[in-house]
């Protein structure tokens, strides 16, 4: 079984702001002329100086595996994303860091069958999820998942991954260490 491609909405952004300066930002968004192509990007921004510097990074990769433009079919979906905020060394520094990721990759499944979903969420906070949503079920993953799922109802299924990591300092509860979130998922048909 192969998948027919459907929805493709992939985007992410980073923002770093120290003291009263304007934030430094970067973002990506899937270009409509490049739907279903593999994306591999690193976005990184920093603001402030010396011990007051804050740094934000988004490393993202997503792919409609084996995508064939002639018939809009693919053999699977996969993505991985890691967001990190490195806090200022000065615990009293005023800074804001934001890393955001939203991945929606859809496929049309024409007949009942089975798919295999492998997914993981590693997060310092409850801010991230991986989700497979469609007519037969809505499977949410908040930690690790590796199992075969029954597609009893044909239709469009969307593999989603999303998080928003936002930090404002000074904040003594953060402990000064970098804060990160990582999500990954792979969806494949089962023969």
Predicted regions span which residues?
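C-terminal edge strands of extracellular/lumenal beta-sandwich accessory domains
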Residues: 2-39, 43-67, 71-72, 160-191
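Short proline/glycine-enriched turn/loop motifs at strand-loop junctions of beta-rich domains
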Residues: 110-113, 121-127
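Short beta-strands within extracellular/lumenal beta-sheet-rich domains
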Residues: 87-108, 146-147
């Amino acid at each position: 079984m192969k998948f027919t491609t459907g929805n493709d909405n992939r985007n992410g952004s980073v923002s770093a702001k120290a003291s009263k300066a304007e934030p430094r930002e970067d973002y990506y968004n899937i270009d409509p002329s490049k739907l279903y192509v593999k994306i591999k990007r690193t976005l990184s921004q920093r603001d402030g100086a010396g011990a007051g510097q804050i740094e934000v990074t988004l490393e993202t990769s997503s792919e409609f595996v084996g995508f064939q433009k002639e018939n809009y079919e693919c053999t699977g979906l996969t993505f991985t994303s890691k967001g990190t905020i490195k806090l200022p060394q000065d615990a009293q520094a005023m800074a804001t860091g934001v890393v955001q990721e939203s991945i929606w990759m859809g496929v049309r499944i024409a007949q009942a069958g089975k798919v295999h979903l492998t997914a993981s969420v590693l997060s310092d906070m409850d801010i991230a999820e991986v989700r497979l949503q469609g007519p037969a079920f809505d499977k949410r993953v908040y930690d690790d998942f590796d199992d075969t799922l029954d597609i009893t109802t044909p239709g469009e299924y969307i593999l989603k991954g999303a998080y928003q990591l936002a930090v404002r300092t000074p904040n003594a509860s953060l402990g000064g260490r970098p804060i990160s979130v990582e999500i990954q998922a792979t969806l494949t048909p089962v023969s």
